[in-house]
């Protein structure tokens, strides 16, 4: 498995790029979120990668952050979602926006992405609901905390956020036991996710 590539950025032809790593030129497909952050050609670049081996060839995908790659891998686990669609999703939404859309079940945000219809969006939300929050707890928790930050009942918001991330009520309440009464939503979600990730 090729997990990371560092080398000279030779070509940029969205969504493909060519990276020279020690004399070997690697073709990678990247989401537009990564593409727009790339340096100029002729300079060094380092990307997290995912290698897909299929009957019709080997395909390498590059990502600016490990969170993007993790989200890509979770998207590939959704039935009927291939690499092209997964790249389209990450090109249309940041990882934190995707985490929020999944947690709050916002199909409307997904159908705005080219190639994503209503049924596909609903399937994505359903199948990712129990996976994305656990795969990316810090991103999802921080995003939900930002959304719920102004709500008056912090404990209720923390519980709802954890349930939206795919944890059951018993797990969520167990993680909330040690929280102080005056804990804010943002800190509460962060502390609870920390405990749940160790469980």
Curated annotation (Swiss-Prot):
> Residues annotated as region Domain III?
154-199
Q: Where is this region: Domain I?
A: 1-64
In terms of SMART domains, this protein maps to: HhH1
Query: Which Gene3D superfamilies does the UniProt record give?
Result: 5' to 3' exonuclease, C-terminal subdomain, DNA helicase RuvA subunit, C-terminal domain, Nucleic acid-binding proteins
Q: Where in or outside the cell is it found?
A: Cytoplasm
Just give the chief location class. Answer: cytoplasm
Q: Which UniProt keywords apply?
A: Cytoplasm, DNA damage, DNA recombination, DNA repair, DNA-binding
Q: Report if keyword Protein biosynthesis is assigned.
A: no
Extract the GO molecular function terms from the UniProt entry. ATP binding; four-way junction DNA binding; four-way junction helicase activity
Q: Which CDD domains match?
A: UBA_RuvA_C
Q: Where is this region: Domain II?
A: 65-143
Q: What is the annotated role of this protein in its UniProt record?
A: The RuvA-RuvB-RuvC complex processes Holliday junction (HJ) DNA during genetic recombination and DNA repair, while the RuvA-RuvB complex plays an important role in the rescue of blocked DNA replication forks via replication fork reversal (RFR). RuvA specifically binds to HJ cruciform DNA, conferring on it an open structure. The RuvB hexamer acts as an ATP-dependent pump, pulling dsDNA into and through the RuvAB complex. HJ branch migration allows RuvC to scan DNA until it finds its consensus sequence, where it cleaves and resolves the cruciform DNA.
Subunit structure, per the record? Answer: Homotetramer. Forms an RuvA(8)-RuvB(12)-Holliday junction (HJ) complex. HJ DNA is sandwiched between 2 RuvA tetramers; dsDNA enters through RuvA and exits via RuvB. An RuvB hexamer assembles on each DNA strand where it exits the tetramer. Each RuvB hexamer is contacted by two RuvA subunits (via domain III) on 2 adjacent RuvB subunits; this complex drives branch migration. In the full resolvosome a probable DNA-RuvA(4)-RuvB(12)-RuvC(2) complex forms which resolves the HJ.
Alphabetical list of NCBIfam families matching this protein: ruvA
Record remark on domains: Has three domains with a flexible linker between the domains II and III and assumes an 'L' shape. Domain III is highly mobile and contacts RuvB.
Regarding protein family, the annotation reads: Belongs to the RuvA family.
In its UniProt entry, what is this protein called?
Holliday junction branch migration complex subunit RuvA
Say which species the protein is native to: Azoarcus sp. (strain BH72)
Q: What is the lineage of its organism?
A: Bacteria, Pseudomonadati, Pseudomonadota, Betaproteobacteria, Rhodocyclales
